[in-house]
Amino acid sequence: MSQDAAIAEQTPVEHLSAVDSASHSVLSTPSNKAERDEIKAYGEGEEHEPVVEIPKRPASAYVTVSIMCIMIAFGGFVFGWDTGTISGFINQTDFIRRFGMKHKDGTNYLSKVRTGLIVSIFNIGCAIGGIILSKLGDMYGRKVGLIVVVVIYIIGIIIQIASINKWYQYFIGRIISGLGVGGIAVLSPMLISEVSPKHLRGTLVSCYQLMITAGIFLGYCTNFGTKNYSNSVQWRVPLGLCFAWALFMIGGMTFVPESPRYLAEVGKIEEAKRSIAVSNKVAVDDPSVLAEVEAVLAGVEAEKLAGNASWGELFSSKTKVLQRLIMGAMIQSLQQLTGDNYFFYYGTTIFKAVGLSDSFETSIVLGIVNFASTFVGIYVVERYGRRTCLLWGAASMTACMVVYASVGVTRLWPNGQDQPSSKGAGNCMIVFACFYIFCFATTWAPIPYVVVSETFPLRVKSKAMSIATAANWLWGFLIGFFTPFITGAINFYYGYVFMGCLVFMFFYVLLVVPETKGLTLEEVNTMWEEGVLPWKSASWVPPSRRGANYDAEEMTHDDKPLYKRMFSTK
């Protein structure tokens, strides 16, 4: 039998072993073995691209995987529910009576400090949970990890419901429930990104944000339904419904496949094949499934050569992980600095300030706009790409925030804040708040989760995603805690702060964030390792699809003047 024939009869796993053995001998020269092994662990040094790609099928073929990913994404609903309900709790009479303080005349109130702590401490719990509990996904699998963090979330809800009149008990409950949501925020997008077909990955990961908006909207509606009660029904019923959402999440995990990348990492090759086959609705022995498994195994085997991943590897610039970590943390931070939670956490309070008699109703309007707009976001993320959507989102939100803040500063109180507000100015502000929410929900709401979930190599993915997501929670805490103080001091001038952040976001995306639409996770990794310039990334072609005339070096440098580079795509 010839050598070529022998290779042709090898299984994908046997072929991979042969390739790895040969490449290992090449990479083992004494002079720079350690350096090359480190690079090889992230995919450099050899190319393991699937020879046969999984074909794109009609939309009806992806109904099953879409439903499964929506079940995983339901973790976002849990987070959104908290955001939608807490904004109403802090304005409900029974909640204020139990957890607030008393003026000298006997009236109850929540101080700015206590309000800020109750609202925002949830984010600190989320940041800690994202860093600590996301490790469960590497240890026991993404599915088991999600179930465990949901149970932790339930414990936090029990503590909150059991609170009678001690605000610090409620405070502790929010920290613990935040731990669970922090783990969910890392593991849900991670699992979706690893089970979804590459041409649907952006859409399906965006379903996590869709669930967040659904939770916010229904949370607003529940607050509206309970506001007329005079007892703890006002806030205990919305909290009690959290048990239903958590149990649905746990039940849904029994129907979804485990990450094929995790299964390959722990040696469960047959299960990895089945997971890929189920997600793409093809036979387990389909050549495209075998090729996909081989590509995944190549990355896993290369990672094993370098040993266990450490936290220190997140700061490696040689393998471009540090650059990716900074970009991921910045994208997540900037999502908060858009000012979205200024509306969502304090929506009820804001619209009282513009003179509305029932600000709960206005919050519902914002919730409807937010939820409906996210469907548009799910479409545009794959139609126009991550980078383009982020740029348009930053530009359009800037315009909306300028109008919103300017009207609030110059027209809302024409005769001073001690006089009635202008109804026309208030209506104008609500309209532009809705425009702003539309622009946010279609771009910066879902896309940061997509970008972060597909940026990092498997070897350090959970660690890197937890750090990037923690940056989001940290800024969420800062905005949630300090907003009452800032708005009390400068009122609607606060909008100009977010406007400045939005301008910065536009240029940051323009110069730093690459386009990853239509690429496998392994191809995204290769693009980062090749050092492709972000403004040329849309034209980058993976090694497996390059023609003879393709110039890879052209993607890594640009001799044009800066002003031309910024708006160049080639």
UniProtKB/Swiss-Prot annotation:
GO cellular component terms, semicolon-separated: cell periphery; mitochondrion; plasma membrane
GO MF annotation: an example: mannose transmembrane transporter activity
Site of covalent link Glycyl lysine isopeptide (Lys-Gly) (interchain with G-Cter in ubiquitin): K560
Keywords: Glycoprotein, Isopeptide bond, Membrane, Phosphoprotein, Repeat, Sugar transport, Transmembrane, Transmembrane helix, Transport, Ubl conjugation
Location of this chain's protein in the cell: Membrane
Residue ranges of the TM segments: 61-81, 117-137, 144-164, 175-195, 202-222, 237-257, 341-357, 364-381, 389-409, 432-452, 470-490, 492-512
Statement: the UniProt record of this protein carries the keyword Transport: yes
Family: Belongs to the major facilitator superfamily. Sugar transporter (TC 2.A.1.1) family.
Summary of the function given for this chain in its UniProt record: High-affinity glucose transporter.
Protein name (Swiss-Prot/TrEMBL): High-affinity hexose transporter HXT7
Species this chain originates from: Saccharomyces cerevisiae (strain ATCC 204508 / S288c)
